[in-house]
From Swiss-Prot:
The keyword rRNA-binding applies. This protein binds to 23S rRNA in the presence of protein L20. The lineage of its organism: Bacteria, Pseudomonadati, Pseudomonadota, Alphaproteobacteria, Rickettsiales. Belongs to the bacterial ribosomal protein bL21 family. NCBIfam families: L21. Part of the 50S ribosomal subunit. Contacts protein L20. Coiled coil: none annotated. One of its GO terms (biological process) is translation. GO terms for molecular function: rRNA binding; structural constituent of ribosome. It comes from the Bacteria. This is Large ribosomal subunit protein bL21. GO terms for cellular component: cytoplasm; ribonucleoprotein complex; ribosome. Keywords: Ribonucleoprotein, Ribosomal protein, RNA-binding, rRNA-binding. The keyword Protein biosynthesis does not apply.
Amino acid sequence: MFAVIETGGKQYLVKKGSVIKVEKLEAEEGKEVEIDKAVCLSGNGLSYLTDATVKAEVLEQCRGEKIIIFKKKRRKNYRRKTGHRQYITVLRINEINLQK
């Protein structure tokens, strides 16, 4: 069984036992979170399923890879180099439920 969930403005295809990296969630490591925005469950449709939930365990709160931002204006000796690291949460999917 698989599900498509939405969190942090992005959609993820998940199965039981899969590990995903999502935008930062307010949860401590080792705690369980419940995601109720299931877009699709085993191909049942493309609308939000109000009775479907996905339970996941928070494995880690960390930061992603660094993204380099480089701005330049030619012939003007203008160069700016900055970087950014986004906070992410690593989840392990434990359970996919569909209450009927």
